[in-house]
Amino acid sequence: MNLIRFLLVFQGKIQMNESRKKLNCQSRQFNVDKISDLPEDLLVHILSLLPTTNDIVATSGVSKRWESLWTKVHKLRFNDRIYDGKRYDSFLHFVEKSLILHKAPTLVSLRLSVGPKCTADDIGLWIKLALDRNICELIIKHYPDHGHIRLSRRLCDSKTLVSLKLKNAILGAIWLPTCFISLKTLHLRYVKYSGDESVRTLISSCPSLRNLVVKRHNEDNVKRFAIIVRYLQSLTVYLSPLHGVADSDAYVINTPNLKYLNIKDHYTDLCSFEDMPYLDEANLDVAFTHTENFFESLTSVKKLSLCLKKSNAQYPEGIIFSQLDHLELCTCDDSKWLNILAMLLPDSPKLRVLKLNDKNHDFVDKYCSCTWNQQPSYVPECLTKSLEIFEWRNYKATFRERDVAVYILKNSTCLKKTVISPKLKISGEICDHHIIREDLASLFMGSSSCELKFD
């Protein structure tokens, strides 16, 4: 899409269809003049929507008015992949010159995507120039197949940085007690640290932090990952299995104002949680050996998704999930999820939505005759008063799973909608969906108004 078409589409003046793809030279010149009459703020905003700063700078030749417009664009994006090795010096010069000539009062965003030819000194210079222009968001991505790039301590000089997103970077022990006083969003993807203490110091040096995303790998040099942030509201932690098992022992999470929690980690054994009274949503796909502590921290949650394949899931008696409205359980391991379901149903009096799904698609012994012997001793309150939606994806029709389906459909007197999707294959063999559907359709349902569907 050329610039003229881009600008016209933005204004809503033309439709993107085959019949109007060609513009003659006269109409193009007319459109350029017409667009040039737009207010400068609007033109600058339109330019900021172009993919890269190279594209933005290229518009300087459109007309005299456009010569310096690009210097006022508040978002800059650089990617060295568009330069071959022989022209890499041109890329370095282009980035430096673009930052030096930048005239907007605030540099809202700087995105750098760089590879092995880019050095720590190059990054350091660009960071310094960006800090001089009151940068708000900094994104640095280093190509994953070329190792990591060490970042300069100049980052600590920022007073205006609100969002920092790093990928494949090395962070040393360079952080001050209040390094990022304005930072609210921090993304650390496949970052190397100097040790446990560097993580604790880095995160605690962000007193205003609200959103933290951590994607780890097995070479991040951290065993005990501590996240202690008073005002944090959203936390996502992911440990990548791509490079083997990480040498990770535990998480320490102290975030009393957290509202959203998402952890996927099949290797770390322990997690220490402090109370999270404002937590609304939690997604946990973990292998923690002991779960008592984190269940105690989830009592205020409204939406809960659990996959505890390797965990011996237990929590103390007396815990009530009084706000739980939406529960999703992964059914990848019968011996684990059935126990969790039997515990949570009686302790979730307001549960309205129950979803079951085999997310990991593990091997299933379809000839196993084991039944569900962990049913609650009484019909849970949620089944008779609140449960309205029941969905089961990848239903395997084992004896245990059929017992669960029978129990829920029989005792749920408020159900409005039930959707069951049989698994396509079990242990490599195609399932007979017709037989499964006939069996489920014949079951007694406690709710006469429930709509039963099969996907």
From Swiss-Prot:
Domain F-box as annotated: residue spans: 32-81
FBD domain spans which residues? 372-421
Q: Which InterPro entries match?
A: F-box-like_dom_sf (IPR036047), F-box_AtFBL13-like (IPR053781), F-box_dom (IPR001810), FBD (IPR006566), FBL13/AtMIF1-like (IPR050232), LRR_dom_sf (IPR032675), LRR_PRU1-like (IPR013101)
User: Gene3D superfamilies, from UniProt?
Assistant: 1.20.1280.50, Ribonuclease Inhibitor
Concerning PROSITE patterns, the annotation shows: FBOX
* PANTHER family referenced in this protein's UniProt entry, alphabetically: EMB|CAB62440.1-RELATED (PTHR31900:SF34), F-BOX/RNI SUPERFAMILY PROTEIN-RELATED (PTHR31900)
* Protein name in UniProt: Putative FBD-associated F-box protein At5g56400
Classification lineage: Eukaryota, Viridiplantae, Streptophyta, Embryophyta, Tracheophyta
